[in-house]
Swiss-Prot record:
Protein family: Belongs to the class-II aminoacyl-tRNA synthetase family. Phe-tRNA synthetase alpha subunit type 1 subfamily.
Protein name as annotated: Phenylalanine--tRNA ligase alpha subunit
CDD domains in the record: PheRS_alpha_core
EC assignment: 6.1.1.20
Cofactor note: Binds 2 magnesium ions per tetramer.
Subunit structure: Tetramer of two alpha and two beta subunits.
Taxonomic lineage: Bacteria, Pseudomonadati, Aquificota, Aquificia, Aquificales
GO biological process, one term: phenylalanyl-tRNA aminoacylation
Reactions this protein catalyses: tRNA(Phe) + L-phenylalanine + ATP = L-phenylalanyl-tRNA(Phe) + AMP + diphosphate + H(+)
Sorted UniProt keywords: Aminoacyl-tRNA synthetase, ATP-binding, Cytoplasm, Ligase, Magnesium, Metal-binding, Nucleotide-binding, Protein biosynthesis
Matching HAMAP family: Phe_tRNA_synth_alpha1
Amino acid sequence: MGLKEDLKALEEEAKKLIEEASDIGKLNDIRVNYLGKKGKIKSILKTLGKLSPEERKEIGQLANRIKDELEEALKEKTELLKKKALEEELRKNRIDITLPPQWIESGSSHPVISTLIEISQIFISMGFSVAEGPEVEKEKYNFDMLNIPPDHPARDMQDTFFLNNGDILRTHTSPVQIRTMLKHKPPIAVIAPGRVYRKDADPTHSPMFHQIEGLLVDRDVTFRDLKGILKIFLESVFGKDTKIRFRPSYFPFTEPSAEVDIGCTVCGGKGCRVCKGTGWLEILGCGMVDPEVFKAVGIDPEEYTGFAFGLGIERIAMLKYRITDIRLLFTGDMRFNQQFKGIR
């Protein structure tokens, strides 16, 4: 068999292998075996020196044609295999839009968070700013500078969480007011929302709960201003027809001090189990800032007056949404939260 026949035989052999190849790796092997530097076609061409010039030209042209055709065949088969691989990948990852969707349970805003946001927005609309502070607090800011003496019951280990280094978990957000007055000079109008901690746990109390306190300090601030602000707030939360009353009370950091009640939201003031037959619900504490507190933060009580108030967010949420057990607010049960979805 001559060189021409050998080349044509290699051509047919290579084209058959290319046609049968099932992956790109096999095509690469064919390229190396037939077209590589040590491939079969190259081996045949090494014998061209034994031929006459006319035969070398003819065989050379034939070899070049075969190489070009094999390269083209390899290219086409490579593109075909890549296309098939892509189609297979798309087939495997195809989304069947006829399948019923997987149910994804959606959450909803927690009633405490909803209430906190609502209350904050009411006071912000009246010109108050939001102030924040640390939850791990110094006794100095939590008690001493708020005119709470060392022998006060609130400072007992039965009521306060004390840490090993002498710090405490804040029992109210009043320390934020102290820090604000130390940092800023009057006029001051801030609310301080956040988590607070007390050793108490029953259906109406939690060792951790949310509180929001307010402080306004300026010249000529009166108790009438305090009553007006709280009236706007309570009517915004519970409705324009809400009955409100102020009762004299005592807090170490305010003087005079008052407790604020609203007409029972359950019985309408007629008397029920929730209001214990009184027709009233205790809602918050308030008062005029004690001069001793002003002195502790370097504000002249002869020049400035101010008022402060504080309330529990959980308390407001329970009254607004008629929740009977505070522990329900901390279960993390989505079924409970979803009851309040879309309710404001």
